[in-house]
């Protein structure tokens, strides 16, 4: 066995030794100690008496110990060589009593108190747990001193000093020490039941404190458990999964296995209290208290398990402008049909018909046509529409003078310009190449007839000056310069070689 395996070594020097010392002369003095030297090498008495015996004088005890050490050694023991026969070797040959510690050192009586201070003031908790208290050792020493040689040849206190393993392992040596010591003066040894095993804490000094602590600890944990259970009971819905827990019945429902004993694991549903034989059956069980909440879209009947998903889905069902636009043209179409029947339909190829759908028409327009009640957002769209009406009336052969509200509403002009317009009648007619008759003056663009040339010129200036582009080679008129250019390139390719005046301003003569 390796050295230092059983006993913890420390920095402080102790009288314990684990090997034979060859050159020391103090060993003989230790063996010849009047107090406990002879207890190590003296052979056992043939019949130890448990009762107390009177201690012999110190001189006789010293001579007896010396004689026993030099001459009375057993056979298995090595030949005596002075005091070295009592060192660590075969202790069973010198003392047949049961020894529980293989390291039984030699000690002096006068160093007992110093040994107590060294061995029990160590900083290691292991040594404090492994060895008894100094009071018990001192008490044992007092009792052993009274017993003398009748205690099996041991010094007072040796059973407790040199057998720490016995104190930790069992009660055999303590019982033997009690029997060997017998009733003597001094305090009794501590009972074996009071000696605790190593690694355990000492019991509390009072017995009233542990129950108080034990009562306080559960009291501190109970409110937490109650609060947790109460919180779990409040959670009865799942907003994401769409599940809800219904309220339980008043009486607890009976288990499925009627009349059978309770299952071993007691796999019980915590909601409906139904019992199952195994956890797999409990996992597959569909509780009657758990219901699925469905959120259905009222527009398309689509089902969702979360109300937030339904709200996101319903954003796609906002009212669209297509149905409103489809309902709006119904009265407008009726008005166009009436206008189509009243003036009739025939017009030139380049002029739109009044009954046609105009892309500029709008229900919320600010400019309204008094013929068909159609509204336009811009005056230009309304003028274009009125020209179509006038061309239709001219083709029918019954031209009517446009109402005054059309001209006044669209182009309100000052009245003082009328004489200047009348003075420039001849020049304006010559520029446009118009042949005015004595009876009436027709508008070359829309075919309206006027009583005077000034009225016709005013009509041309206000209504057709900026938007009408007449063709030089044919009586067709256009409302934009690109339209006139396309017409000339398509219908008059041979005359396109000449320089064409795209726009002829109508101005009165100075």
Swiss-Prot record:
Q: Where is the composition biased (Basic and acidic residues)?
A: 329-351
Q: Which Pfam families match?
A: zf-C2H2
**Keyword field:** Cell cycle, Developmental protein, Differentiation, DNA-binding, Metal-binding, Neurogenesis, Nucleus, Repeat, Repressor, Transcription, Transcription regulation, Zinc, Zinc-finger
Q: Could you name the domain of life of the organism this protein comes from? A: Eukaryota
Q: Explain what induces or represses this protein's expression.
A: Up-regulated by transcription factors, such as MASH1, NEUROD1, NEUROG3, NGN3 and TCF3.
Q: Single Gene Ontology BP term? A: adrenal chromaffin cell differentiation
Q: Tell me the tissue specificity.
A: Expressed in pancreatic duct cells. Expressed in several tumor cell lines of neuroendocrine origin including pheochromocytoma, medullary thyroid carcinoma, insulinoma, medulloblastoma, retinoblastoma, pheochromacytoma, medullary thyroid carcinoma and small cell lung carcinoma.
Major location (coarse): nucleus
SMART domains of this UniProt entry? ZnF_C2H2
Where found, per UniProt? Nucleus
Which cysteine-cysteine pairs are annotated as disulfide bonds in the entry? Answer: none
Instruction: Give me the ranges of the annotated region Disordered.
Output: 1-110, 176-226, 315-362
Q: Where is the composition biased (Pro residues)?
A: 43-59
Positions with biased composition (Basic residues)? 1-12
Q: Where is this region: SNAG domain?
A: 1-20
Report the domain remarks.
The C-terminal region is necessary for NEUROD1 promoter DNA-binding and transcriptional repressor activity.
Supply the name of the protein.
Answer: Insulinoma-associated protein 1
| Species for this entry | Homo sapiens
Phylogenetic lineage: Eukaryota, Metazoa, Chordata, Craniata, Vertebrata
In the UniProt record, what gene is named as encoding this protein? Answer: INSM1
């Amino acid at each position: 066995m390796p050295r230092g395996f059983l006993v913890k070594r420390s920095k402080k020097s102790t009288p314990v030794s684990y090997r034979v010392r060859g050159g020391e002369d103090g060993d003989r003095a230790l063996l010849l100690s009047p107090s406990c030297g002879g207890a190590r090498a003296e052979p056992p008495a043939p019949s130890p008496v448990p009762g107390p015996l009177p201690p012999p004088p110190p001189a006789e005890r010293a001579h007896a110990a010396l004689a026993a050490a030099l001459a009375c050694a057993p056979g298995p023991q090595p030949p005596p060589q002075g005091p070295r026969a009592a060192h660590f070797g075969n202790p069973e040959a010198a003392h047949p009593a049961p020894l529980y510690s293989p390291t039984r050192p030699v000690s002096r009586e006068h160093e007992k108190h110093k040994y107590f201070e060294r061995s029990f003031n160590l900083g290691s908790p292991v040594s404090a747990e492994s060895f008894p208290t100094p009071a018990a050792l001192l008490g044992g020493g007092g009792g052993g001193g009274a017993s003398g040689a009748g205690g099996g040849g041991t010094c007072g206190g040796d059973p407790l000093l040199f057998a720490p393993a016995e104190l930790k392992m069992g009660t055999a040596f303590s019982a033997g020490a009690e029997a060997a010591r017998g009733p003597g003066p001094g305090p009794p040894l501590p009972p074996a039941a009071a000696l605790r095993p190593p690694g355990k804490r000492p019991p509390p000094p009072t017995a009233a404190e542990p129950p108080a602590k034990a009562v306080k600890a559960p009291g501190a944990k109970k409110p937490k458990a109650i609060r947790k259970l109460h919180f779990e009971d409040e959670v009865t819905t799942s907003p994401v999964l769409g599940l809800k827990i219904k309220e339980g019945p008043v009486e607890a429902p009976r288990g499925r296995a009627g009349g059978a004993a309770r299952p071993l694991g007691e796999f019980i549903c915590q909601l409906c209290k139904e019992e199952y034989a195994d956890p797999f059956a409990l996992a597959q069980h569909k509780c009657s208290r758990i219901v699925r909440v469905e959120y259905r879209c009222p527009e398309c009947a689509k089902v969702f398990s979360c109300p937030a998903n339904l709200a996101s889905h319903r954003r796609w069902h906002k009212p669209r402008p297509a149905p409103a636009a489809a309902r709006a043209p119904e009265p407008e179409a009726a008005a166009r049909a009436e206008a189509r029947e009243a003036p009739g339909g025939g017009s030139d190829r380049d002029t739109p018909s009044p009954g046609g759908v105009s892309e500029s028409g709008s229900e919320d327009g600010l400019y309204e046509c008094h013929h068909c009640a159609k509204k336009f957002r811009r005056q230009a769209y309304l003028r274009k529409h009125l020209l179509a009406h006038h061309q239709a009336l001219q083709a029918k052969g019954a031209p009517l003078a446009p109402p005054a509200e059309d001209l006044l509403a669209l182009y309100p002009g000052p009245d003082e310009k009328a004489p200047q317009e009348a003075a420039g009648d001849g020049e304006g007619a010559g520029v446009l190449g118009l042949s005015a008759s004595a009876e009436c003056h027709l508008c070359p663009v829309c075919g309206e007839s006027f009583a005077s040339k000034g009225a016709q010129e005013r009509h041309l200036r206000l209504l057709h000056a900026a938007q009408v582009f007449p063709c030089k080679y044919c009586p067709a008129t256009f409302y934009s310069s690109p339209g006139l250019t396309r017409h000339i390139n398509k219908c008059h390719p041979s005359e396109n070689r000449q320089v064409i005046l795209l726009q002829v301003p109508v101005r009165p003569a100075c």
